[in-house]
């Protein structure tokens, strides 16, 4: 569609469904802002050069894991009402992850076990009774930080 685009910014109003599809060999940055709670993002794009992804909105049921869409992303900032549908498996180079849950419901489970290169994780939301699954090979400083965060919030850290 736009063969030379490096930065993509989409802002949607009025409950629209946004679809990111196709393949991009030049895209490096993606920002999707859905202003209405009824809007959703269906992400099935293949964009291996993307390094930074910022998504504010709900994920559609047909979305692929973000690691399949953006396998080389180094930074993900996700703000959503359905955080349990955020799947970062496959983001091989992910170093920074920020997840923000916009509801007051319990999150459930977040699986970070495949993301061994993570150096920074920030999870905001109702973490009580949330299970955060991490890798045994994860950065030790990050594990210590996650232990403190999860303990304060009433979440459970599980090593795999």
What are these regions (language model features)?
Residues 16-20, 24, 107-160:
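Leucine-rich solenoid repeat scaffolds
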Residues 18-20, 41-44, 53, 62-65, ...:
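Canonical leucine-rich repeat
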Residues 31-36, 43-46, 53, 57, ...:
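The feature captures the LRR N-terminal capping module
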Residues 1-10, 110:
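Low-complexity/repetitive intrinsically disordered segments
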Residues 5, 15, 27-30, 50-52, ...:
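Conserved hydrophobic position(s) of the canonical leucine-rich repeat
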Residues 1, 12, 23, 41, ...:
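Small-residue (G/S/T/A) turn/hinge positions that recur once per unit in extracellular repeat modules
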Residues 11, 21, 33-35, 56, ...:
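Feature marks extracellular polysaccharide-active and adherence modules
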Residues 2, 21-24, 44-47, 66-70, ...:
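Hydrophobic anchor residues at the C-terminal helix/turn of individual leucine-rich repeat
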């Amino acid at each position: 569609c736009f063969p030379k685009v490096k930065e993509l910014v989409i802002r949607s109003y009025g409950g629209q469904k946004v679809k990111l599809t196709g393949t991009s060999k030049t895209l490096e940055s993606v920002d999707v802002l859905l202003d209405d709670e009824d809007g959703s993002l269906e992400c099935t794009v293949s964009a291996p050069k993307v390094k930074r992804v910022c998504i504010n909105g709900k994920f559609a049921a047909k979305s692929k894991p973000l690691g399949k869409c953006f396998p080389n992303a180094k930074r993900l900032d996700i703000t959503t009402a359905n955080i349990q549908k955020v799947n970062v498996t496959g983001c091989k180079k992910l170093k920074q992850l920020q997840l923000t849950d916009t509801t007051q419901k319990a999150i459930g489970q977040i699986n970070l076990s495949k993301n061994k290169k993570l150096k920074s994780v920030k999870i905001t939301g109702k973490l009580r009774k949330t299970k955060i699954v991490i890798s045994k090979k994860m950065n030790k400083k990050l594990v210590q930080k996650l232990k403190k965060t999860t303990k304060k919030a009433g979440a459970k850290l599980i090593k795999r």
